[in-house]
From Swiss-Prot:
Taxonomic path: Bacteria, Pseudomonadati, Aquificota, Aquificia, Aquificales
NCBIfam families, sorted: thiE
Pathway linked to the protein: Cofactor biosynthesis; thiamine diphosphate biosynthesis; thiamine phosphate from 4-amino-2-methyl-5-diphosphomethylpyrimidine and 4-methyl-5-(2-phosphoethyl)-thiazole: step 1/1
Native source species: Hydrogenobaculum sp. (strain Y04AAS1)
Record family assignment: Belongs to the thiamine-phosphate synthase family.
Protein name per its UniProtKB record: Thiamine-phosphate synthase
């Protein structure tokens, strides 16, 4: 169940940030810095390599009580006993995923606008990744929806929403005002050489932003 996990700082991996980096060590450093969940997302990597990396990451994430979500690859998620799978508009439908995965695994679903959100509200999903909220280099083909749409999204559904797309230290406070359950980040952490420090700084900013809203 989604409530069993903390998705407040949800790291999403991207091929572009791992050209000269070790995947496992980099994610481990981000965990040491304070991320609470990680989505393993690679589009240009052999399945065997992904499986081997995920096996190691499964142990690390379990030890640190960090949720491990696998993007798109339901087979790999099942094979390594991940906490869940995340699918998009062109991937395997959520209802099909639910029929395949164990009952204790969750399904996340990407939604790019309010119309798609309305459709998603009828699906068997555990959380929604909504965005891109802002312009982002990692999703160049996505139109950004803005804060107004994000706030509307959290108001019209009880399904937990994770904000995604272009979220940085500079706009985090405004994003959290929309009452999201967490933020998905890529470059805000992976865009720095010292990933542990970047994650730690982002975590501190997250805490400060939340405290200002109380």
């Amino acid at each position: 169940m989604f409530k069993d996990f903390n998705f407040s700082i949800y790291l999403v991996t991207d091929d572009a940030f791992f050209v000269d980096r070790d995947v496992v060590r980099t994610i481990e450093q981000a965990i040491e810095g304070g991320i609470t969940a990680v989505q393993y997302r690679f589009k240009n990597k052999p399945s065997r390599k992904m499986y081997e990396e995920l096996l190691v990451l499964r142990d690390i994430t379990k030890q640190n009580k960090v949720a491990l979500i696998v993007n798109d690859r339901v087979d790999l998620a099942i094979a390594v006993k991940a906490d869940g799978v995340h699918v998009g508009q062109e991937d395997l439908p959520p209802d099909v995923c639910k029929k395949i995965i164990p009952e204790d695994m969750i399904v996340g679903y990407s939604v790019n606008n309010l119309e798609q959100l309305k459709d998603a509200m009828t699906m068997p999903i555990d959380y929604i990744g909504f965005g891109s909220v802002f312009h982002t280099k990692t999703k160049k083909d996505y139109k950004y929806v803005g804060l107004e749409a994000l706030c509307k999204a959290t108001n019209i559904t009880s399904i937990p929403i994770i904000a995604i797309g272009g979220i940085t230290h500079y706009n985090l406070k405004d994003v959290l005002k929309c009452k999201v359950k967490g933020v998905a980040v890529v470059s805000a952490i992976l865009g720095f050489e010292d990933v542990k420090r970047a994650a730690s700084d982002f975590k501190q900013m997250y805490k400060e932003s939340l405290s200002m809203q109380i």
